[in-house]
Amino acid sequence: MKIDIFDTTLRDGFQQEGISPSVKDKLAIAKLIDELGVDFIEGGWPGASPKEKEFFDTAKKDLNLNNAKLVSFGSTRKLNTKVEEDPQVQALIDSQTEYVCIVGKSSNLHITKALETDVDNAISMAVDTVRFLKENNRKVFFDAEHFFDGLKENAEVTLKILDSVVNEGVECFIFCDTNGGTLPHEVTELLNPIIEKYPDQEFGVHFQNDNGCAVTNSLAAVNLGVKHVQGTMNGYGERTGNADLCTLLPNLSLKMNLETVPEKSLEKLTPIANHIAELVNIAIDSRHPYVGSSAFTHKAGLHASGMSKDNTLYEHINASQVGNYTRTTVSELAGRASVITKAKEFNIEFSNDEAKNLIEQVQNLEYEGFQYEAADASLYLLMKKIKGEEPEFFSFESFRVYSERRNSQNVVSEAVCKITVEENRFVTTGEGVGPVDALNKALKSALKNNYPDVDKIKLTDYKVRIIDSSDGTEAKTRVLVEFTDGEMIWSTIGVHENLSLIHI
């Protein structure tokens, strides 16, 4: 059975606090979502703001989607306004998308208190808008706002609205759990008789995640025969978010064996999810199902030992099916099997003696405050050192960094680095908003002649922890930093009493 995937990241997902993408970012994210192979991408509300209008105006010219249909979003006509005179309805026409999605009230409480009108007017608003859009050759999706709450409050009113809209011939009628409070068993109880009554009508679902059940509710609806599912990448959305497509897609495809996106496209899920996270500047939770960095990570012990024999012993799917990868962390508790498995991840062949050597070094370093579980790049270099293969890209001679306050206002840091790269000595300076920024600029300045790609590297995460606060200002500090060059992500760790030395 084919399930239509309707992505609403660009509209409902971006109602999340802290997300305010530019038009350029929205266009880039639309291309990424299209690459995933979804059926529909809801671009936004063209009548809502100049930025939304600019997005659709630009999309007409420059957004070439290979898989998805772009959908514009709006609402039913305003109360006491003719549909042909409603500017936000006209904006839907002007967006020139083949598909439009309109939202309308389906709860008696919202009709009487939010709209301050009666059911007949609410039905007229919905019917007029659907009819007008269809007369203008648009294919219409209808988001029935507060549908589940409406059924619980006054089912007669909600079902009357449903019947009126369905009779207008909408492409899909979407049951919306706008407040996100519906439970899975309620989905079955409330929707089953409706789906049976309208066997020829396509239905969809849109669940908010306020009670943590958005994905589960979506799966329950699909089990009833719903063939249209809405959600957002990484679960973005207002309050606690929407049904998360990064969890929903693998569950539908790999667990329920339903047709959603192409298999090869699903294998891009993790990198696409991470790329979108970078564009909106909100890191994915490491423990996020399927796409998190820890989703297929195994710590030393029985799990890691079992994984060295057969991945299926401790993984419910092959990580590569969603573009992720299996990872084994190494800590002071690691055994030789775990170390050898981890080395293979780096394409390094370790003997038992070398594994024993690494374990001893990790134990000693962790006693000093290091922690290698989240610092694969540092662990890789340690393994290379044990193999006698540690690369030397440059040799460090010295550095100096200081900060000063200028004009009684700004504090500026300056750094001087002296390094040798392939027998060429460089003395470079850098000025930044702090010591770390200044050192970073000075070091990049010295390296970019031989390694021009260093300009692509940027800091994406930075964690500082004092190891033993009883030592006061002389305490050792652990710094874990994460970098990316736009394609790969890696982490390194440093421990010292001097913060500047750690950063170098």
Regions found by a protein language model. Give the residues of each.
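A mid-to-C-terminal "edge-of-domain" accessory segment
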Residues: 2-3, 7-9, 256-423, 429, ...
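Hydrophobic faces of well-ordered beta-strands that scaffold small-molecule active sites
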Residues: 5-8, 41-43, 68-74, 100-102, ...
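Conserved, mostly hydrophobic/aromatic
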Residues: 13, 33, 100, 142, ...
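Alpha/beta enzyme core
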Residues: 21-36, 82-113, 118-140, 147-198
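Glycine-rich, positively charged N-terminal anion/phosphate-binding segment
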Residues: 23-27, 41-94
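Alpha-helix-loop-beta-strand connector modules within alpha/beta enzyme cores
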Residues: 52-75, 124-136, 190-205
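Catalytic cores of alpha/beta
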Residues: 88, 212-224
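Conserved small/polar residues in nucleotide/adenosyl-binding loops
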Residues: 502-504
